[in-house]
UniProtKB/Swiss-Prot annotation:
Identification of the protein by name: Prolyl 4-hydroxylase 2
Cofactor binding note from Swiss-Prot or TrEMBL: Binds 1 Fe(2+) ion per subunit.
Organism in which the protein naturally occurs: Arabidopsis thaliana (Mouse-ear cress)
Cofactor(s) recorded in Swiss-Prot or TrEMBL: Fe(2+); L-ascorbate
Gene3D superfamilies in UniProt: q2cbj1_9rhob like domain
Tissue: Expressed in epidermal root hair cells (trichoblasts).
């Protein structure tokens, strides 16, 4: 083989290695998750802030995708689960599908890696804009109705991605939370709005992410997870919400009467007595079938 041909092959091999390395840096979640940037801010609920989770490019990209499709935000009715406009939530927003483009897919990968929760358990990202005076009153992210819980179960966790800085206001506040004992009290309370001083608060900072769990470790809804978005006093707030369920949210619901198990762990859970301990999830009702009807001998 001539030296020129050998040199060409070597050049191509090196180029492929460089391209593969670059791809890993962009798309491999494990290469960009840095645990040292995470700090716990609350023990009840379990809440954590990841500093610099998103790049400026990722933040700006999500905003640009959302700008043309913003609509008035809605809330879920506690009785029937239907979405409705309410003064409780005055922002505007839109959903962005998980596979919208490579940047969005990369963000989804990072979220799954950080939370240790499958991508299919998450809803699409909801990008929100809060203008002057707009807010989201204190609420829970787990469900009170049986309609929404039928698809993927409760929301086990929420991640709030802060896409912009806010001059004043716009904090996320947990009114009933218990502060983490080893938390660094570097946050200057004087910089917080009056709303944020009513509990443990996280200031919106571009690129940061807030993860908190809506369920306790025994899967019971956590009353300490009550949280709200304080009114924006100066500036404009952009954020993105990722709600993550205990089961697959992408799964298509069927009511064809087939006696099946949705989760591969159903048989083991049934042996452990979960059919009686957690009948809503395992067995369900005639209107909303559970996820482990076969193993629970409910059909």
């Amino acid at each position: 083989m001539s030296m020129s041909r050998l040199g060409l092959l070597l050049f191509v091999a090196i180029l492929l290695v460089l391209l593969q390395s670059s791809t890993c840096l962009i798309s491999s979640p494990s290469s960009i998750i840095n645990p040292s940037k995470v700090k716990q801010v609350s023990s009840k609920p379990r809440a954590f802030v990841y500093e610099g989770f998103l790049t400026d490019l990722e933040c700006d990209h999500l905003i640009s995708l959302a700008k043309e499709n913003l609509q008035r935000s809605a809330v879920a009715d506690n009785d029937n689960g239907e979405s409705q406009v309410s003064d409780v939530r005055t922002s505007s927003g839109t959903f962005i599908s998980k596979g919208k483009d490579p940047i969005v897919s990369g963000i989804e990968d990072k979220l799954s890696t950080w939370t240790f929760l499958p991508k299919e358990n998450g809803e699409d990202l909801q990008v929100l804009r809060y203008e002057h005076g707009q807010k989201y009153d204190a609420h829970f992210d787990y469900f009170h109705d049986k309609v929404n819980i039928a698809r993927g179960g409760h929301r086990i966790a929420t991640v709030l991605l802060y896409l912009s800085n806010v001059t004043k206001g716009g904090e996320t506040v947990f009114p009933d939370a218990q502060e983490f004992s080893r938390r660094s009290l570097s946050e200057n309370k004087d910089d917080l709005s009056d709303c944020a001083k009513k509990g443990i608060a996280v200031k919106p900072k571009k690129g940061n992410a807030l993860l908190f769990f809506n369920l306790q470790q025994d899967a019971i809804p956590d009353p300490f997870s009550l949280h709200g978005g304080c009114p924006v006093i100066e500036g404009e707030k952009w954020s993105a919400t990722k709600w993550i369920h205990v089961d697959s949210f992408d799964k298509i619901l069927t009511h064809d009467g087939n006696c099946t198990d949705v989760n591969e762990s159903c048989e083991r859970w049934a042996v452990l007595g979960e059919c009686g301990k957690n009948p809503e999830y395992m067995v369900g009702t005639p209107e909303i079938p559970g996820n482990c009807r076969r193993s629970c001998k409910a059909c």
